[in-house]
A protein has these predicted regions:
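An exposed, glycine/acidic-rich loop-and-rim segment of catalytic or binding clefts
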Residues: 1-327
Length: 327
C-alpha cells in the first residue's frame, strides 16, 4: 500500500490530501501560520485503521441498523463493523481504499474510486469522484457519483477541526453555531429512531453561538456513558436537520483565543456534530481534541422513508458540495 500526499495552495490556504481514503490531511491557514485540522502525523500512520481522521466515509456515512436495507423486494445484508450495525461503510469502507488521483492542478485535486457490486454488501457498481478545490480563503469538498443499479449512497468528510494555535489544547474554548431548529433522536446505539425533535429548551440548541466546553462540562462529563469503542455518550454525536436557506449556511465554528473562524456551507440536508469523545491515537490524539462537522444525508435513511432519500437511480449523476470559509 503506497500512500501519496498531494498539495494545492494559494496566498490564503495550503491544502494537503492523501490518496488513502481521499483524506484531508492539512488545512494550513497562512495568515495565522497554523494547521486547522488534526492528523496522524506521518502519512504512513494511515495504513492502519484509525478514527476516520480526515477521511472520506462511504459508501454510507453514519450508521445503518442491523446492517441491512430493502430495495424493492430484495433485502441486502451489509458487512457489519459495530456490533450488528454498520458504521461509515463497513469494515473496508472508502476510508481504507487507495483512491486514484485523476487530476491535479494548482488549486484543484480530483480523486476517483470504482466500488464493485456487493462491495461491503451494497448493490451496484458505483463510481465516485472526490474533488478538493481552492478559491481565495474558501475551499470546497465536492462529491460526484453514479451507479448502474439502485443503491444507497451517503458520503462525508470526517475531519476533526481544532482552531487552537497549539493542537495540544482541546476544543473547550471553541464556540459553535448550527443553522438547525431540529435534530434526529437516537437510541443508545446512536441509531436514529425516526423521530425529529426540536432543539428548543435542550442542550442541543446551537442556533446562537454556544461554548462547546461549557455544554460538555455541564451536561456530559458527570454522567459518562461509554457503550463501546465507538459509542461514547460523553459528548455530542448527533445529526442536525439543516434549515433550508438560499445561501446553504450550515454552521460556524470560532475560537476565542486564536480568533480564527470557519464557516460551513453545503447543499446536503444534515450535519453530524461529533466532539471526539472517543478519539485516541497513540500519544498524539486524545478525547475532545477535535470537532467534526460532517455534512451528509441522515444515518439510517435507507430504513426510514420520511428521511431525505439516499436511494440513487441507475446511471444518474449526483453532485453535492461543502464549502469552508476560513477567516
Amino acid at each position: 500500500m503506497k500512500i501519496n500526499c498531494s498539495t494545492i495552495e494559494n496566498k490564503y490556504l495550503r491544502i494537503k490530501t492523501l490518496n488513502i481514503g481521499a483524506t484531508l490531511f492539512e488545512v494550513f491557514y497562512k495568515e495565522k501560520k497554523v494547521n486547522l485540522i488534526l492528523n496522524l502525523g506521518s502519512k504512513d500512520n494511515y495504513k492502519s485503521k484509525n478514527f476516520y481522521v480526515g477521511s472520506t466515509c462511504g459508501r454510507f456515512a453514519g450508521r445503518i441498523s442491523k446492517s441491512k436495507f430493502i430495495i424493492g423486494n430484495k433485502k441486502y445484508k451489509l458487512n457489519n463493523n459495530e456490533g450488528n450495525n454498520i458504521l461509515h461503510g463497513g469494515k473496508k469502507g472508502f476510508d481504507r481504499i487507495i483512491w486514484k488521483k485523476i487530476k491535479h492542478s494548482k488549486q484543484k485535486i480530483v480523486y476517483k474510486i470504482e466500488s464493485p457490486h456487493k462491495d461491503q454488501g451494497f448493490p451496484g457498481n458505483l463510481i465516485v469522484k472526490c474533488i478538493y478545490q481552492l478559491k481565495n480563503n474558501n475551499f470546497f469538498i465536492k462529491y460526484e457519483y453514479f451507479s448502474d443499479k439502485l443503491t444507497h449512497v451517503n458520503l462525508t468528510n470526517h475531519s476533526y477541526w481544532n482552531l487552537n494555535l497549539n493542537k495540544k489544547n482541546d476544543i473547550f474554548n471553541h464556540d459553535l453555531k448550527i443553522n438547525a431548529n431540529q435534530y434526529l433522536e437516537v437510541n443508545n446505539y446512536l441509531i436514529p429512531t425516526g423521530k425529529i425533535k426540536s432543539v428548543s429548551n435542550s442542550i442541543n440548541d446551537f442556533r446562537k453561538y454556544s461554548n462547546i466546553g461549557k455544554k460538555i462540562k455541564l451536561n456530559f462529563l458527570k454522567k459518562v456513558k461509554k457503550i463501546s469503542k465507538t459509542i461514547n455518550q460523553s459528548g455530542f454525536d448527533l445529526t442536525y436537520v439543516i434549515n433550508k436557506k438560499i445561501d446553504y449556511f450550515v454552521a460556524s465554528l470560532k475560537n476565542r483565543d486564536s480568533k480564527i473562524k470557519v464557516d460551513v456551507y453545503s447543499d446536503l440536508p444534515g450535519v453530524q456534530l461529533y466532539t471526539s469523545q472517543s478519539l485516541k491515537y497513540k500519544k498524539k490524539l486524545f478525547p475532545y481534541q477535535g470537532l467534526c462537522l460532517e455534512t451528509q444525508f441522515f444515518p439510517e435513511a435507507p430504513n426510514i422513508k420520511k428521511f431525505p432519500s439516499t436511494l440513487t437511480k441507475p446511471h444518474k449523476l449526483y453532485k453535492y458540495f461543502t464549502k469552508f470559509i476560513i477567516k
